[in-house]
């Protein structure tokens, strides 16, 4: 509730689209999940207060991401999250450092990276992957999707799995790239 995706997308020239979940719109199993956690500062502040944090007593977190992405997105997140009681420190690193510290060693609190790979939902079913997301229901739904012999049935299992991941909110999908061809 604390991240204004529309503002982020607008700052990028409105060429990208809101994603809302782990499956992009061009992949099997896609469902528009952007409505699960709409931007709502009051709701975000309420949840932060329930957790014991306010703008006067913020939760301190560090966001580690590769400096190849520039600083604007990190600055936007820092500004947006400050409004709900999160003091975000930005740790810009070389991509090679990100690969070692975050991806290989899992040494991070928050991270930001361009996950533009197609058909990569399986990563959400692999607790050893650097997300360390572990939900047996998601793993079972994904296994059913792979075993299904009917494409529509497989898509339904993928949709259920993706919705569960999104509801658990182990990540925030800031936006998807809109492919443009000239």
Predicted regions and their residues:
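Structural transition elements
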Residues: 17-50, 70-72
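Short, flexible loop/turn elements at secondary-structure junctions
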Residues: 3, 27, 65-67, 94, ...
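Ligand/substrate-recognition segments at binding pockets and active sites
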Residues: 16-17, 49-117
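Solvent-exposed, polar/charged alpha-helical surfaces in well-ordered, non-transmembrane soluble domains
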Residues: 1, 6, 10, 21, ...
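Extracytoplasmic/peripheral linker and loop segments enriched in polar/acidic and small residues
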Residues: 9, 88-98, 122-182
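Periplasmic-binding protein-like
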Residues: 1-27, 72-73, 165-175
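Hydrophobic alpha-helical scaffolding
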Residues: 34-38, 67, 131, 151
